[in-house]
């Protein structure tokens, strides 16, 4: 990940100079590198980028959004299921090591929720929250609003599936929910007709007008 760190040094400085230093609405940083396991060099890379973000901005919060190497982590392959999916225990071991190395410069972790099966949500989410609490980090969920279970990549997710994921995050005591990706898969202005309906169901569920 050395090249990613080197490239982002310039990006971080440019973003702060052009936007962060000029606009009060700039509230923090998303460190956009995505990993799922204890990738070689990842701890050092995230620590370096997180520290630079905080140094230039006077300590504004930072977050990352990794994915879980679960059954549905098959992008870039011809497989239907990842037969080398990480176990809950191994996930806990590897992310304990990662959090231990980055928690002083990364404030929150928003694990993507779409690569594991629905019957695994509680087990993985409980571990994620436990680890975040251990290291004084916030635990968010990145609720994917597209469906990985369809033969077409990708369509807006059925609301019942999105609800299951959000309710699992609530049971685990997560601090916040974000989504990927609203504009394509949940916005009433999306080219997908289903996206507007998903937004309507979301508003109904939460009593929003």
Task: Indicate where each model-derived feature is located.
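Glycan-processing catalytic domains of CAZymes
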Residues: 1-209
């Amino acid at each position: 990940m050395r090249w990613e760190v080197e490239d982002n040094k310039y990006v971080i400085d440019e973003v702060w100079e052009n936007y962060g230093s000029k606009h009060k609405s700039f509230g923090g940083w998303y460190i956009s590198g995505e990993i799922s396991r204890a990738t070689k060099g990842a701890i050092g890379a995230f620590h370096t980028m997180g520290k630079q973000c905080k140094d230039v901005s006077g300590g504004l919060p930072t977050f990352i959004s990794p994915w879980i190497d679960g059954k549905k982590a098959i992008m870039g392959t011809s497989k239907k299921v990842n037969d080398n999916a990480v176990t809950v225990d191994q996930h806990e071991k590897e992310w304990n090591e990662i959090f231990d190395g980055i928690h002083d410069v990364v404030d929150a972790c928003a694990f993507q929720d779409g690569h594991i099966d629905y019957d695994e949500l509680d087990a993985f989410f409980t571990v994620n929250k436990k680890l975040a609490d251990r290291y004084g980090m916030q635990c968010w969920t990145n609720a994917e609003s597209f469906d990985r279970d369809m033969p077409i990549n990708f369509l807006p997710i059925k609301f019942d599936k999105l609800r299951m994921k959000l309710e699992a995050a609530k049971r685990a005591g997560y601090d916040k929910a974000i989504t990927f990706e609203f504009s394509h898969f949940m916005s009433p202005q999306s080219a997908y007709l289903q996206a507007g309906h998903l937004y309507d169901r979301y508003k109904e569920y939460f009593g929003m007008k």
